[in-house]
Amino acid sequence: MAISTQRDSRWAALALIVTAQFMVILDVAIVNVALPSIKSDLDFSPTNLQWVISAYAILFGGALLLGGRLADLLGRRRLFVTGLALFSAASLLCGVAWSEASLIGFRAVQGLGGALLVPAALSLLMTIFAEGRERNLALGIYAAASGSGAAAGVLLGGLLTSYLSWSWIFFINVPVGLAAIALTPLLLRESRADLPHRHFDLPGAASVTAGLMLLVYATTRAAGDGWGAPVTLALFGAAATLIAAFVVIELRSKSPLLPLRIFRLRTLTGANAAMAIVGAVAFSEFFVLSLYLQDVLRYSAVQSGLAFVAFALSVVVISNVAQAVVGRFGVRPTLTLGLLASAASVAWLARLPIDGHYFWDLFPAFMLGGAGMGLSFVPITIGGLAGVERSDAGVASGLINTSRQIGGALGIAAVSAIAATATRNYADTHAAVTATSAPALDHGFQTALYVLTGLLLAGAAIALTLVKPAPAQAAEVAPADADAVALDEAA
């Protein structure tokens, strides 16, 4: 194999990969509770503040497929280190940002670093562990890091912002990134796809990266300009044109960036669709609940962060149990159960009153929601790599992460618009209520959470429809080929 298979070094390598993944996912959410401080210190306008999140999401989500294929062609360890270096440098620059434009620009560079790092990390994991029980365990740990990263980000963001400053939500990445770069040559060997060519699909890369970025940008703009505004429609039209051009290019290319044949794998297709929904819900839920806790319940940044500890712990614990559940029952029932549990949790949260109590109103829903996410991320990650050939390991890793990030970016933009519209409508129809009052804000948040509940129910239907049923024992069958990258389609 391309990576050392000694038992101790494999798990040390996994720890390195998981740490890098956790750091990148953490940064998606860590800024949420720091936004009020950032707004005050850098004199952000209300309309530009969302770009602290959106700039990261646009570059991260838009360039993941590019990062995945570059890892296959140029070397997974090389892209892993490059991504770490870019992410760490951008984090340092974010911490010393002096204006709106500088912080937004450095966040975009940070997102690009994440787009190079994440698919390389997951494809390295696939080459370290052969399919079967050990890989499922490794993927369970990886998924736990991914699933808990957002919740941990809210907690850590609150602590750092309250006791140090918002700059430290970025500075904290620098020593972690430098340590990871130093350890990489010791724990990871170079790995690249065994392809008959080294051609790079530049037209495909340019069209899909621009198309996905424009799609996220259009959705973000729609929140302020309106969904029917000419500029919004023009942006969506341009994004659709670029993505359609990408499909045509890939169908004709001899060395496609994204081999469209992989979508013939039902489990992979269903897993990516479910991941887009889970990403939309996870990003939006933390965004909405962070605002609910601070604007309606008047929690401090630290209190808001601590409120999510139950959710984070539930994700970590259940993610590590979920790999055994997948091994016993298969991807489809585990994923469906996770999505339904998440839907029940969000529906519970949609009933939150303006004087909600943490232990009676929030804690049970957070525990159930964390369990649902834990039961979802593991089968999605396993299913998203099901049947993938070794030569496509990087691009499959990029695809599953693209589904998550694009879903999250689109979700948070759409849900923000829905919540804002519902809040304004409530204020307009209640004479004594303003759009910034707790009752109006609470109504907007409730409306957004009901929409997310519907999305999760749709995800459960997709899992039942697209994900291939499997014999219970399939996920634990030992591999015939130790170098195989693909998980058995029956996993």
Located regions from the model:
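Intrinsic disorder in cytosolic terminal tails and internal cytosolic loops
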Residues: M1-S9, D194-H197, T436, L466-A491
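A gly/Pro-rich, aromatic-decorated transmembrane alpha-helix motif that marks the paired
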Residues: S148-L164, M213, Y217, I406-Y426
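12-transmembrane solute porter fold
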Residues: W11-L26, V31-V33, P46, P203, ...
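A residue-level signal for alpha-helical anchor/packing sites in multi-pass solute transporters
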Residues: L124, I128, L159, L183, ...
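Short helix-kink/termination motifs in transmembrane helices of multi-pass secondary transporters
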Residues: M23-A34, L59-G62, R76, I169, ...
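Transmembrane-helix bundle of Major Facilitator Superfamily
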Residues: M1-L186, N320-A322, F329, L335, ...
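C-terminal membrane-cytosol helix-exit motif in multi-pass small-molecule transporters
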Residues: L122, V174-A193, T209-R221, A238-S253, ...
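Flexible interhelical linker loops that connect adjacent transmembrane helices
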Residues: A2-S4, I181-T209, L251-R266, G327-R328, ...
